[in-house]
Amino acid sequence: MIIEPRMRGFICLTAHPAGCEQNVKNQIEYIKSKGAIAGAKKVLVIGASTGFGLASRITSAFGSDAATIGVFFEKPPVEGKTASPGWYNSAAFEKEAHKAGLYAKSINGDAFSNEIKRETLDLIKADLGQVDLVIYSLASPVRTNPNTGVTHRSVLKPIGQTFTNKTVDFHTGNVSEVSIAPANEEDIENTVAVMGGEDWAMWIDALKNENLLAEGATTIAYSYIGPELTEAVYRKGTIGRAKDHLEATAFTITDTLKSLGGKAYVSVNKALVTQASSAIPVIPLYISLLYKIMKEEGIHEGCIEQIQRLFQDRLYNGSEVPVDEKGRIRIDDWEMREDVQAKVAALWKEATTETLPSIGDLAGYRNDFLNLFGFEFAGVDYKADTNEVVNIESIK
């Protein structure tokens, strides 16, 4: 079929298999171009199919020749209907990894559930024996706690008072004002239950209890802080509470891993265009201004550049892992530079529907958004008849 982007709000309903494959190949080429990383050799990636999780899997495999197991929850294709992009990304990753002689297997299902944990533990036991790196990179709006059976839904709200600020509809370029009513206590609890560190700790406990973590094993989860501009809706809002919980969980997990000489880290990453960030009011406008400045300064990074730098310069740099006063790894350091943030804040005041095309990088934002779904890649013939039914080699 001929596959084109079909939009509904912040979501693209279609994905292009050849474009997703090109995206994965581009990331692999980038990693190969940067040279070997003395990293982990057996890696479990929970949330492995898009964004930072996919970039972590690619960096491990093609930077360190690691065997990887990827867990994700994606929609497979059916005739006449495309898969979700993460399915095509994972199919392409496995194809390339197997071609390179690397072990790569994937599990598709709800990583929050006991069943998928069980399946993953059994696969590690059978094929790898143990893992020495666990990446936790889940992005989901809903979680059913396997122990209580309660389904929690996260919300994106400020805490304390209504938040009003500018936002942009990145499809139309229309800058408008948005108001978000504050969260109640239940909203906060639900968001922490979904996006906090509870499930990360459950995974590590399960792996450790069955002796599936190697001596000196490391685990890492991803967080975001961001500037004052977004903090009311992000870091000081419901999501921020969840991130606080995630960051606190790193210390609990480090205690759990003491007997193995292992460690848990949270890496604070930069703002990027993802399906999740596109749905957050204020963030798309912030990102389009940030991109403009970081590109001008020559310090712009996408997911793969961020994770390559995280592995090469922080995690596997041959000495101590540099952290901030709260024990976090900071690869948002270039975004949060004072000069960069001062420029963004100045542009923010000027941003209107009329000025944004010249002061921001809305085109870059749109391009990155379409890239998430496999569109707008050079070297892909989007007019060609494309087979939407693509299989992942390890998923039968």
From Swiss-Prot:
<comment type="similarity">
    <text>Belongs to the TER reductase family.</text>
</comment>
<dbReference type="InterPro" id="IPR024910">
    <property type="entry name" value="Enoyl-CoA_Rdtase_cat_dom"/>
</dbReference>
<feature type="binding site">
    <location>
        <begin position="73"/>
        <end position="74"/>
    </location>
    <ligand>
        <name>NAD(+)</name>
    </ligand>
</feature>
<feature type="active site" description="Proton donor">
    <location>
        <position position="234"/>
    </location>
</feature>
<keyword id="KW-0443">Lipid metabolism</keyword>
<dbReference type="InterPro" id="IPR024906">
    <property type="entry name" value="Eno_Rdtase_FAD-bd_dom"/>
</dbReference>
<comment type="pathway">
    <text>Lipid metabolism; fatty acid biosynthesis.</text>
</comment>
<feature type="binding site">
    <location>
        <begin position="47"/>
        <end position="52"/>
    </location>
    <ligand>
        <name>NAD(+)</name>
    </ligand>
</feature>
<feature type="binding site">
    <location>
        <begin position="110"/>
        <end position="111"/>
    </location>
    <ligand>
        <name>NAD(+)</name>
    </ligand>
</feature>
<feature type="binding site">
    <location>
        <begin position="272"/>
        <end position="274"/>
    </location>
    <ligand>
        <name>NAD(+)</name>
    </ligand>
</feature>
<feature type="binding site">
    <location>
        <position position="243"/>
    </location>
    <ligand>
        <name>NAD(+)</name>
    </ligand>
</feature>
<dbReference type="Pfam" id="PF07055">
    <property type="entry name" value="Eno-Rase_FAD_bd"/>
</dbReference>
<keyword id="KW-0560">Oxidoreductase</keyword>
<feature type="site" description="Plays an important role in discriminating NADH against NADPH">
    <location>
        <position position="74"/>
    </location>
</feature>
<dbReference type="GO" id="GO:0050343">
    <property type="term" value="F:trans-2-enoyl-CoA reductase (NADH) activity"/>
</dbReference>
<dbReference type="GO" id="GO:0004318">
    <property type="term" value="F:enoyl-[acyl-carrier-protein] reductase (NADH) activity"/>
</dbReference>
<dbReference type="Pfam" id="PF12242">
    <property type="entry name" value="Eno-Rase_NADH_b"/>
</dbReference>
<keyword id="KW-0275">Fatty acid biosynthesis</keyword>
<keyword id="KW-0520">NAD</keyword>
<dbReference type="GO" id="GO:0051287">
    <property type="term" value="F:NAD binding"/>
</dbReference>
<protein>
    <recommendedName>
        <fullName>Enoyl-[acyl-carrier-protein] reductase [NADH]</fullName>
        <ecNumber>1.3.1.9</ecNumber>
    </recommendedName>
</protein>
<dbReference type="InterPro" id="IPR050048">
    <property type="entry name" value="FabV-like_NADH_b"/>
</dbReference>
<keyword id="KW-0444">Lipid biosynthesis</keyword>
<dbReference type="Pfam" id="PF12241">
    <property type="entry name" value="Enoyl_reductase"/>
</dbReference>
<dbReference type="InterPro" id="IPR010758">
    <property type="entry name" value="Trans-2-enoyl-CoA_reductase"/>
</dbReference>
<feature type="binding site">
    <location>
        <position position="224"/>
    </location>
    <ligand>
        <name>substrate</name>
    </ligand>
</feature>
<comment type="subunit">
    <text>Monomer.</text>
</comment>
<comment type="function">
    <text>Involved in the final reduction of the elongation cycle of fatty acid synthesis (FAS II). Catalyzes the reduction of a carbon-carbon double bond in an enoyl moiety that is covalently linked to an acyl carrier protein (ACP).</text>
</comment>
<dbReference type="GO" id="GO:0006633">
    <property type="term" value="P:fatty acid biosynthetic process"/>
</dbReference>
<keyword id="KW-0276">Fatty acid metabolism</keyword>
<feature type="binding site">
    <location>
        <begin position="138"/>
        <end position="139"/>
    </location>
    <ligand>
        <name>NAD(+)</name>
    </ligand>
</feature>
